[in-house]
């Protein structure tokens, strides 16, 4: 697999490069960075003390011309620009970017009619298995239990709630026959009145170097059930992204998520 990495000088980008270099079935074909980055022109493996022969570049057209897959954990506007180039060059996409608006997500879904892509706010196998647990739990606790989602991330994360927290909320809402827009409450402040039992509450914590902690609380009378996933490093995200790329090898077009990749549907 000839794989290019977008956001190659960032925390996640470096983890992805390391994973690609370690994978026997993958070759690093490109390393894309933002225009103006001081790392442009440097070898993509310099942070590992390795020479890959692949220099960091801001030329998306060149990157897509040399790669069969592009793994993108950047920001929505950047990902959509990369999507346009991927469509022109018939490059398969693995997208782990979070913070998309609904119209932007619609653009990703539409692209699946022309190229194969996996889009997921979290590529971790553990998180996606957790989604199945939440689907089951939500059906059992649909009545008489208040649902709250608490997430914590590092101080540099720019969007809230996290994409994973929103995925959890969407999973719970769908399992109970609703949409998240109908029942989400984001943070509370001041005199809010009594809790509406039909809502799903979200709380976001930002601090330090927390990779990603997510807890869903089902609070009933006399008992509480908590389902928690904690990420100790970004390795699980990188390995999940490679697994998604391998999945795409068998598809020419289509819009998929990690539930498809893992056979959890």
Swiss-Prot record:
Enzyme Commission number(s) from the entry: 1.17.1.8
GO molecular function per UniProt: 4-hydroxy-tetrahydrodipicolinate reductase; NAD binding; NADP binding; oxidoreductase activity, acting on CH or CH2 groups, NAD or NADP as acceptor
Record localization: Cytoplasm
Principal localisation: cytoplasm
Reaction equation(s) it catalyzes: (S)-2,3,4,5-tetrahydrodipicolinate + NAD(+) + H2O = (2S,4S)-4-hydroxy-2,3,4,5-tetrahydrodipicolinate + NADH + H(+); (S)-2,3,4,5-tetrahydrodipicolinate + NADP(+) + H2O = (2S,4S)-4-hydroxy-2,3,4,5-tetrahydrodipicolinate + NADPH + H(+)
Record function comment: Catalyzes the conversion of 4-hydroxy-tetrahydrodipicolinate (HTPA) to tetrahydrodipicolinate.
Name the UniProt record assigns to this protein: 4-hydroxy-tetrahydrodipicolinate reductase
């Amino acid at each position: 697999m000839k794989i290019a990495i977008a956001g190659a000088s960032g925390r996640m980008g470096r983890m992805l490069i390391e994973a690609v270099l370690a994978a026997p079935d993958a070759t690093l074909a490109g390393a894309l960075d933002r225009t103006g980055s001081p790392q442009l022109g440097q070898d993509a493996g310099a942070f590992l003390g390795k020479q890959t022969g692949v220099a960091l570049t801001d030329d998306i057209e060149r990157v897509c011309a040399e790669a069969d897959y592009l793994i993108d954990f950047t920001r929505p506007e950047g990902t959509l620009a990369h999507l346009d180039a991927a469509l022109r060059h018939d490059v398969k996409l693995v997208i782990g970017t979070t913070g998309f608006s609904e119209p932007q997500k619609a653009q990703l879904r539409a692209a699946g009619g022309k190229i194969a892509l996996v889009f997921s706010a979290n590529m971790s196998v553990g998180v996606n298995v957790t989604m199945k647990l939440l689907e089951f739990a939500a059906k059992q606790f649909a009545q008489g239990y208040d649902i709250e989602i608490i997430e914590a991330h590092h101080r540099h994360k720019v969007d809230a709630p996290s994409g994973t927290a929103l995925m959890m909320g969407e999973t719970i809402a769908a399992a109970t026959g609703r949409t998240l827009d109908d029942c989400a409450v984001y943070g509370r402040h001041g005199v809010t009145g009594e809790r509406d039992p039909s809502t799903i509450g979200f709380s976001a914590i930002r601090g330090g170097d927390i990779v990603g902690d997510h807890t869903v609380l089902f609070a009933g009378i006399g008992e509480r059930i908590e389902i928690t996933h904690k990420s100790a490093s970004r390795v699980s995200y990188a390995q999940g992204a490679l697994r998604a790329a391998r999945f795409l090898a068998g598809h020419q077009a289509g819009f998929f998520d990690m539930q498809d990749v893992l056979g959890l549907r």
